[in-house]
Amino acid sequence: MIFPDNIPLNPLKNGQLWISHYPGKRGIENKAIQAEMDLLELKKRKIDIVASLLERKELAELQIANLFELIKKHKFSHYYFPIKDKSAPKNKVQLRRFLNNLCDEIQKDKKILIHCNAGLGRSGLIAALICKKLGIVEEPIPFIRQYRPGAIETREQEKLISSLDLA
């Protein structure tokens, strides 16, 4: 079962930001069946958008190569921005575009789930950058870790959060 953590975005109306492991992760024998169950749970929580950070090769390695098809089957909007595990994106232009898209959706009161593998490093990174861009907090790293312990796993991720100009 999927149990995403909510990152409070007050005072932003009804837009919501959630972080989790990938749908299907807890599936022991059949990850696709678990992914279906997890996606149904996300629908119950009124999640509108799934933002995936896994690389395509990871999907195969994790035995959930059809995850994106399942996301579409369950009628979620889907944003895809692959980031190598334990690292930070190199292309800042594409990163800013991705963040702008997600922030626009939040400001339209959409509910977004961000996931990578465990929902810690890459997901925490993107959540922190969204909070920084939206001006939710001045120190996004401890803020995200308060709601998702273990989030933002590497110095490279921490440095990017501190240094990236999002104006």
Where are these regions (language model features)?
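Cys-dependent protein tyrosine phosphatase-like superfamily
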Residues: M1-L113, L125-A167
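Short cysteine clusters
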Residues: C116
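Conserved G/P- and acidic residue-centered "switch" motifs that form tight phosphate/ATP-binding loops
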Residues: G119
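Conserved SAM/SAH-binding loop-helix junction
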Residues: R122
